[in-house]
Amino acid sequence: MLHTTLSSSIVMAKPRVIYWFRTDLRLHDSPALKAALDLKPEVLYPVWCWDSHYVYRARVGVNRWQFLIDCMNDVSQSITKINKKSQLFVLREPAVTLLPKLFKAWGITHLVFEKDTDAYAKERDAKVMQSAKEAGVEVIVKSGRTLWDSDEVVKANGGKPTMSITQLQNAGAKVGDIEPAVETPKSLPDPGELKLDFDQTQPDAKPDFNEKYRDNDEASYKEGLSGPKNDFHPPTLEELGFKPATTPHKGGESVILKSLDKIIGDEEYTGTFEKPKTSPAAFEPQSTCLTSPYLHFGALSCRYFYHKVEEVVEKRRKAKKSVSDPPASLTGQLLFRDMYFAAQAALGWSFAQTYNNPNCRFIPWHLPSKVDLSTKLITGDYEVDDEEKEKQLQRWAEGRTGFPWIDAIMRQLRQEGWVHHLARHSVACFLTRGGCYISWERGAEVFEELLIDHETACNSGNWQWLACTAFYAQFYRCYSPIAFGKKWDDNGDYIRKYVPELKDLPKKYIFEPHKAPIQDQKKAGVVVQGDGSQAKEGELMTYPKPMLDFNEAREVCIQGMKTGYHVGLYGNSPKVLDGTWKQLFDDAAEGPTEGKQGGPGGLMTFEDADGADEADQHQPDSPQKGKSGAAGSPSKPTRGRKREHSQGTLDFSKSAKK
């Protein structure tokens, strides 16, 4: 009787839950949010911790900030539509110092969030989980950012990074089927009292990697935890010290779901999509789905997207209609994303650099990164080993190389925050192995600042791919800054849009304006001269002369790549780690400009890339220990590999004696 009386008088306290939003700014298909709601909590606090790492230590330009703020406001409005008492509560303090204080102030029993395998996020989350353990708070973490849990993929791949689509697919098959999407919640619990009876911890604002891009002082932490209006809204661009954004792309779950309905509704487009066949020169509208920034911020679930596309593909297959297959298809693009995420999950911080990266070939690029030997991590600074290369980097980043195709891409990127996948290929190849011979890490940093869809895994992976230091090895296939653009846009409409000083040039000269007679230049209202730093010459607009001879530069780069492949070092090779690699290379890292002939494996030609390389991935040789203890020299790349049905062909190949 006593036992019964005691049992009936005990009322189990209901969970009090913080749902920590991060890169999952959506309500649809959120496994972590479902786990939080399955607790049947008494209160649910949807929280965003304003993280100083991204404010100061990551390169984030104004367009990506605006896109993030759009996504935050959108999901907050969606939360409020379901529960008028709730919203996304943005608290202006990093999670590591803030959450332990919230656990106590709000009487929290559970912390729930979506897993993030980025190197920084892993370290941050480990600290938060330790604090939760000490506070007696249960932590629930669910995978939802990728098709498969990246950590599980790594385990299934033998603890190694996935370096090809095939490896990813094989490992994914071992992990299991891609989970179906979970339903969007129809109700949300009330938040509890928002007591903030503790001091705000001010983060260290130095170093500020974004200081040079700000027009005013950064002030997002100066008005307390709940912001200047005490409304828990996201900081504004003005508070971050930026001018208004210039991107036409608006973020938000509601925005992309409407767009996705249109994409999926066009069954032929969805079912037959092949990335290498889409035009990098298309604009208003672009030729692809432009889902990448929404995937990055989690406004769109990759699993939801994947299954929606698969439904269309299966429907077409049953109807005996044509369909595209990975890796060129829409689902193939999601597989590439998972491949890069799993590669990063395996390697951590070193994935985003050459130094100490066991899967990244070492090439003695110009403008190499400085390294903190105590951590084996790059510092964010680099060595200017050649003043001319420093000028080339700045001209490339600002879109004034004198190659209109390259400049149009870089200007679109800076203005809008997004460019087509093959446009990224063009400018990345040009900066690295196909023109300037500048470290891919410099290009990755510029993209980190400018892209609205920047993800460390995909950005670093793509740059290594295009630099032929990992994932892809056919370095003799280069993107011509002239021929490749002409293939897609012979009239130069894309150039006329983004390089308006050339808009009135005749078609004959639009890709090579320096070849136009001076009278044709003046008639078009432009004069080709200088380096592009001077906008006008009298009444005429100016456009720079080419900053290099592409044909000569390409040959020099290919010779340098050939030497680098022959030496066979990787980022973790002892000679790279101790600096003695210099003994193995000529003073001119990219090799002599003449006197040596022949490409890789005796190849006597180079080729213009056609953009089909992702549908044509040849698995690069894995680094292996040689007798010297360094990574051994891999077998040399060869031509003549059998092309599979899904692979592209060289639409624009040409050969030239070296």
Segments predicted by a language model, with ranges:
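Trp/Phe/Arg-rich N-terminal binding region typifying the photolyase-homology
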Residues: 2-197, 411, 458, 551, ...
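An acidic- and aromatic-residue-enriched active-site/binding cleft used to recognize and process polar
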Residues: 22-24, 49-51, 93, 116-118, ...
